[in-house]
Amino acid sequence: MQCPNQNHMLVNRAMVVAALDSFEDARRIISGVLDLSRLTNTSVKGQHTNDTNYFSRYSNFFSQMPAIILNQLKCCIKAQVDDAVKMVLQKAKKVEVSKPVEKMLTFTTLNTYLGYPESTGCVMEYTEEQSGPIAAKLLITLLSSTLNAMVRPKSDPNISQNKIPRHYYQLKVHVGAQKKVNLTAIEVIRGCQHECSVVYCEFVRYSAYFAGLYDDQVAAILLYAVAAHNVQGFGARFCVLWALMCVRIAGFADDINIYIKHRGMSGLLPQLVEMKCLLGRGVNEIDVETEARRRLDVGSLSMQRLDENELRAAVRLIYSEELRRPVTYPLICDFWSSRWLWAANGSHSRALEHAHPELATRKEGQAYRKAVMEQWQHNPMDRWDGTVYVTPSAKLEHGKTRLLLACDTLSYMWFEYALRPVERIWENSNVILDPGSMGNCGIATRINGWRNGMPGQSFFAVDYDDFNSQHTLMSQKIVFEELFHHIGYNASWVKTLVDSFDSMELWIKGKCAGIMAGTLMSGHRATSFINSVLNRAYIICAGGHVPTSMHVGDDILMSCTLGHADNLIANLNRKGVRLNASKQVFSKTSGEFLRVAHREHTSHGYLARVISSAVSGNWVSDHTLNQQEALMNAIVCCRGILNRSLPGEKNPVVRVISRSVSKRTKIEEKTIRLLLSGRACLKGGVVYGEQTNYIQVYRINCRVERSEEKLPPYRHATEDYLNNHLADIEVMAVRQYGSDIADIMAQASWKKSMSTEGAEDVSRLSLQRDKTLPCLHCITEKETSLLPVRYGLFSSYPILMMLKDRIPIKEALKLAVTIGYRPQPNSDLELDLWGESNNSCAIEGVLPYNEATSLAQKLPCGGVVIQVIHNVYV
């Protein structure tokens, strides 16, 4: 038999067209029954209309589809239809009802759950029936029965005969698809074949419909099916067909996503939303240059029309709520000389160098800011004239591509200087600049506080349309003018910084294309700050000021009445603020914030999002994960998949992907399975499971093989830091244990840049079985969250922390004594000095991995079981 021909498969247009026809038929039925066009029309009109003709619509669509679909829907509502029949019989005093009456009652009951509320306003409030468990069950039944009936099995001979090469499915053109993916289709297929036969059989049965899909999409579809097929009775066939349909017809995935979220059912059906993510990165490409040039013409931009005085008053109110302590700025020379410590390692734009040749840096590979600052010997900040150099590129997100407008390193430095002291003392009352510090548990606690303290109100999530593009330059200037006015700061550089919004030059292909006429640059240092402040400011200007609201970037969740929400949306529309009308979610039971649906007793992340991340990896930089990074990434991603689908041993995801992770990390597959499943953990990590009696801990041994190629000779940032910012205790530590500290610091700065040139150090990973901790104590997650974060005495000495592994604990104690430390009897020196307890604990319940490990670090000892009261399936 001939080898399978990849090209033959990919050009088999008849196969692809047939697949689309089957899924389009299914889409037409589902969209008709659910009246999905009503929601998309709402996006255009901005106002809801009543649906009084559901009976004829149901009659029309159900007459065109196989009878089994309606019969299965009837099974879901049999009790409700029987009750309706009894009421009719009692009123009419008859023994049985006629077929037309029974049909009418069935359709009326269906509409009670799947229909829409009577509303003519901007915001729709669904009944408990329309957003409850029965409605969710009906939706699953409609989707599954329609797909089973309309999509006939059709297999690819190459798949059914188990003769497929490694790259049977085409890779995307982007370099990330070639080098950065974590899982390939063949790895997931083989994993299913050996460890999840029920999904593998369905894949073979419908394999012809996978023709023409990209490798990462096939991997994502199958991994989704592996994770979800045991959830809520979905079944493997439904999961495969549902994921296939959402990838084949991305517009339908959007429609169902809106339908579920609009009803506040995303917490009931988190496995069905955001399915468009399975398309992966590098899809729906945009014309970057055209999109960027559009921002040069104010006439082509659609920005808000808020009154300037109203906006200023709103911004002032925000600062009065969030900035209640004085802001102090360091000397600019000290800020500059400490750049090794604070510089983020984002991409460096060459546009700055075209305009200022004196700031030119080495041209090899992609430049990153930490490496650039090692090359700049003299401080360029005092010569800044306020010009911002903007370069456009495509930001490849899951399921879509956005325009990224990156700003230069010099402007980044100035806005870092301006904002860092402000962000440190920000209250995070309503405008939240650091949601990570709260975590999903903290957000859930705050939302439940609203739920209990504001009876009669509901959760309202406002959805802006392309929020960055709605900000005028004046509104961005107001954010900073009012900021400096509030903190009473009027240094000479303040005006330059504020005026810089009028001097943003767009650079394309090494040439200046013009001055930006409006919109917020998505790669500006202040993007998140500006968005978050203006987010709440626009709401205040529209009469939406409530104490119970949270704003992060373009995300909003508040607690209010229906009348308040309706008035708010109407006012925002009048003031020119663009909204996605069909995505305004008003719900009594569920509030979505930062892509997590929070219900009263549980919070839910969306499965498709973590599946796509687990498959595709990060395409932002060329840096390839080393073995240790790959292991940690696999543990976090796998825990996310387990939490969002089926936590526990019954989920075959761990077994399906363990061989691939073992191959990448060079760790024995048996050990990998223990770590991915949460039955064992790395030192300082957590295990998961009910009735855990002990914790098995593994210690990482990582041997680094230094690259033969030497680092570039530039290390000005390193030298400036060592010459100006070492404390006496750090000087002593460097003399004894850090003669090569400059090399270590420079390596940290250059690591990301050198990885793009193939000159990165190689890490060889091995794991050693460490101690087994008995579980002797128990504490709730809420009690743990109230414990203070334990900072070590040395935590404020970054160079000392870099040398931690070299300094024996007895010598560390001697250093600590020089700055006043006095050990107490039974002191935990590791914890007191370094602040790192490396405590491993057990999680009884469901928590995201990173939040669980953060809680573990608050505990005074290991071997503790943390009981989760509010499960967070993220």
Swiss-Prot record:
It catalyses: RNA(n) + a ribonucleoside 5'-triphosphate = RNA(n+1) + diphosphate. Keywords: Hydrolase, Nucleotide-binding, Nucleotidyltransferase, RNA-binding, RNA-directed RNA polymerase, Transferase, Viral RNA replication. Its EC number is 2.7.7.48. It comes from the Viruses. It is an enzyme of class 2 (transferase). GO terms for biological process: DNA-templated transcription. One of its GO terms (molecular function) is RNA binding. RNA-dependent RNA polymerase which replicates the viral genome. Catalyzes the transcription of fully conservative plus-strand genomic RNAs that are extruded from the virion into the cytoplasm where they function as mRNAs for translation of viral proteins and also as substrates for encapsidation to form new virions. Once encapsidated, the positive strand is converted to dsRNA by the RNA-directed RNA polymerase. Displays ssRNA-binding activity. Belongs to the totiviridae RNA-directed RNA polymerase family. This is Probable RNA-directed RNA polymerase. It comes from Leishmania RNA virus 1 - 1 (isolate Leishmania guyanensis). The gene is ORF3.
